[in-house]
Amino acid sequence: MKKIIFTLLITIVLISCTTDVDNGPQYQINTVPVVLDAFPTKFAADSVTEIPMKYVLPTNCSDFYNIYYLKNVNTRTVAVQVIKDSQKNCATNINVSTVSLKFKPTFIGTYHFKFWKSTDAAGVDTFYEYDAEVTH
């Protein structure tokens, strides 16, 4: 009886192990430059302001993924992230898209915004930078 149970267990273990590799879609997340038509110079405390950001999807296989948003005291670093299927042959895209950053200030004072625009030759990120006052 022990031999039968042992044989069944070994058979189940061997059948359940597979060497198949999932070659499903593989995705890449990239940051793309942000362009602002205008930036508000004042915000009201505890109210939500939408800041429209324009960006270009690099290929026809790319799609909006996320708004990168980092808070550091009064500085806000913002970037647009896109996702791309890296296993497809993709054509270059020139269509401009828009996404809005919903900003709600939490204190009265000056906020400093940094919107990502590129990485320079030395590998350092560069930004469009704006200051805005929060009153009342």
Where does each model-flagged region fall?
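Bacterial Sec-dependent N-terminal signal peptides
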Residues: K2-V35
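First exposed extracellular module after export/assembly in secreted or surface-exposed proteins
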Residues: Q26-H136
